[in-house]
């Protein structure tokens, strides 16, 4: 009789286990999709936050440069059309503007390629500004910030580059200066990305931003700022053909690991991305699956025990019937 009870309990539990497994698989598939969608949504929001930080950074610097340009152009043309005039009437303003905005350097590149500049070297000489040019084997007219500002006749921002003094990424923002139809020169500021990097260090996720030359200039992961340490060409090339905020997967060349990414263009010259290992993205999904498996096992164990006692109770009359039948046939 105990054998019958056990077999009935096992058969009932086997049916229950099959049902639970089917239900668990179906639930897991729906939960996996839901969780993955939420993870992608969160990663996309990280990129949007990074994009906003970059836009604010450029907007602030562009506005500051335009404000200085307006201030410079308030002077009559005779106070701007020569190096001596610039040094006399504008030089000190460059120093004041640089200190107020914490810029690396502020300068005017003249049509002859010479600079009137306020920078760390002028600070070292304990002067507000200095000249820099042919005597130093430098010609502003050969530099991209000058060429592009003159060619486009509007504000221009260079790709990021490493400042030799601070060894940190920086940009040059430049704009042409015209007074009464006369070209005065190109006004420019060199801007360190320290403020932008400080913002990124408080952002969630592994977000970073790079320029047209695939140089990372701000990142929540500081190792990405070390030039040559990581090759971002794989993610950069895919980002060019993907829509903004379109999730995709790529293989990192350094270790062959599969990774998940979401990217977006910023001003059509920068790209903001978030890149995470696939395992990290899928971790919440498999955590749910593990919890479900544990729950199924616990339910099965308890159901076996419970069904055994239930079957024992409801099959107990069979023992009396069996005894009666045995006695009856013995009597016959």
Annotate each predicted stretch with a short phrase.
Residues 86-102, 182, 186-225:
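Solvent-exposed, extracytoplasmic
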Residues 41-49, 57-154:
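Extracytoplasmic/periplasmic sensory segments of membrane signal-transduction proteins
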Residues 13, 17, 209, 271-323, ...:
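Cytoplasm-proximal transmembrane signaling helix
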Residues 2-37, 41, 293-298:
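Extreme N-terminal signal-anchor transmembrane helix of membrane signaling/transducer proteins, especially
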Residues 9, 27-57, 61, 78-82, ...:
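Juxtamembrane interface helices immediately C-terminal to a transmembrane segment
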Residues 213, 222-223, 229-291:
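Extracellular/periplasmic juxtamembrane segments that couple receptor/chemosensory ectodomains to their
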């Amino acid at each position: 009789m105990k054998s019958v009870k056990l077999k009935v309990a096992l058969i009932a539990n086997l049916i229950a286990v099959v049902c639970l497994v089917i239900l668990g698989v179906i639930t897991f598939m729906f939960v996996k999709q839901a969780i993955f969608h939420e993870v992608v949504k969160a990663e996309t929001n990280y990129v949007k936050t990074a994009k906003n930080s970059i836009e604010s950074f450029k907007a602030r610097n562009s506005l500051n440069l335009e404000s200085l340009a307006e201030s410079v152009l308030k002077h009559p043309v005779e106070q701007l059309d020569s190096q001596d005039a610039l040094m006399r009437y504008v030089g000190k303003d460059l120093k004041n503007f640089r200190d107020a905005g914490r810029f690396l350097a502020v300068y005017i590149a003249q049509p002859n390629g010479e600079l009137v500049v306020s920078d760390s070297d002028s600070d070292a000489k304990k002067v507000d500004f200095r000249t820099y040019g042919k005597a130093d084997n430098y010609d502003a007219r050969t530099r991209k910030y000058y060429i592009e500002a003159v060619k486009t006749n509007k504000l221009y921002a260079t790709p990021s580059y490493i400042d030799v003094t601070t060894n940190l990424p920086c940009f040059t923002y430049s704009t042409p200066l015209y007074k009464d139809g006369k070209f005065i020169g190109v006004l420019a500021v060199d801007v360190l990305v320290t403020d932008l990097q400080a913002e990124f260090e408080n952002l969630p996720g592994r977000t970073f931003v790079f320029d047209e030359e695939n140089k990372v200039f701000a990142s929540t992961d500081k190792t990405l700022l070390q030039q040559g340490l990581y090759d971002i060409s794989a993610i950069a090339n895919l980002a060019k053909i993907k829509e903004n905020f379109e999730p995709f997967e790529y293989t990192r060349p350094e270790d062959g690991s599969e990774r998940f990414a979401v990217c977006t263009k910023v001003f059509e010259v920068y790209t903001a991305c978030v890149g995470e290992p696939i395992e990290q993205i899928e971790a919440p999904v498999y955590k749910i699956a593990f919890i479900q498996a544990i729950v199924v096992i616990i339910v099965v164990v308890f159901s076996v025990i419970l069904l055994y006692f239930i079957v024992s109770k409801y099959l107990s009359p069979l023992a009396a019937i069996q005894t009666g039948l045995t006695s009856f046939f013995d009597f016959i």
